[in-house]
């Protein structure tokens, strides 16, 4: 009984203490919005949480559960018309898109009546994956936008749109339609050197631009940049990047500055690296499905995790369904919810319908604090758009006035 009273008082303090600041917005801008605040609290923050071998096992288990991801190295050379048609239709079934007859007809499903031979290609720039074969609309919440792929990503090409402008592809963690002009087609042996490059840099900052000819191409955190070798000359790496000539892949050398924005290996998986990596996105614009060359909530946490070599699914619902479970919120009181969230480790992912957040820790008052790519929140029934990566607590509300703490469905963390 005494413990229950303490929890109840803690919850009351939690909500009363945030009421005045909530009216001014959900973003925390004091010392808690700095990585140093959290790193200084972790005496063992740089100790390794998972070894490389353990991360391999974690990735393998997640891959088994995620029906959007694929083991491309062992991908079949052919795919049946039935299976491919089901996959193409799954994209629109999952999100119930409203679209014109012409756009749906452009999927060219009437011509899909026999097994298809898989072709191999590599992305030459950051490219959008679309749920239907149509270009972006310019809408900040374009419902046909799936995600975005980095340059130099190996993909399996499965089908083409009726107008010949889009290819239906399977990437490591997503499938959908991409602009065919962003794909360099090649043979499987060359393709494998991009799927598993022998020498590469890992992008450890939120965004890294590399000049290829007269164009800057964008790599996001966790992306691999293939290298010609591991030699540094004049503080520059020499990248090996794909371009398109006569419709096929050719390679070009590009210079990459040897700075703290890249590493020759994935970062160690530590508590402090969850903090450091997440704060590199602080203030970035919210980019639905990777639009605006940025991240939404699930891409944000995916990139933080992959910078340490952990491959989690792209979408929040898949992340919650495929990652190891820390907690599920079924029939628990508010006090119990607060206790569970307080015990979740730094780097844990907190889920509520349509959103995912990364836990930073508990502040000096014991309040759990999160960092996330937030689109909007509600205040007194009014929807307020923030559209940025920010630090907050879990008191902000949804459309029905329910605080985030009360709407959490689960917490996930590798193990």
Question: What do the predicted segments below correspond to?
Answer:
Residues 274, 288-318:
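Active-site nucleophilic cysteine motif
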Residues 8-15:
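Bacterial N-terminal signal peptides
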Residues 30, 36-37, 373-377, 381-415:
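Low-complexity, Gly/Ser/Thr/Pro-rich intrinsically disordered linker/tail segments
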Residues 24-130, 140, 156, 170-208, ...:
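Boundary regions of SH3-family modules and the immediately adjacent low-complexity/disordered segments
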Residues 152-153, 220-228, 346-347:
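Loop/turn positions that initiate beta-strands
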Residues 148, 313-380:
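...with weaker cross-activation on analogous glycine-rich loops/strands in unrelated enzymes
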Residues 142-175:
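A conserved hydrophobic secondary-structure block that centers on an alpha-helix together
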Residues 142, 260-265, 283-292, 346:
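Second-shell loop/turn segments in exported
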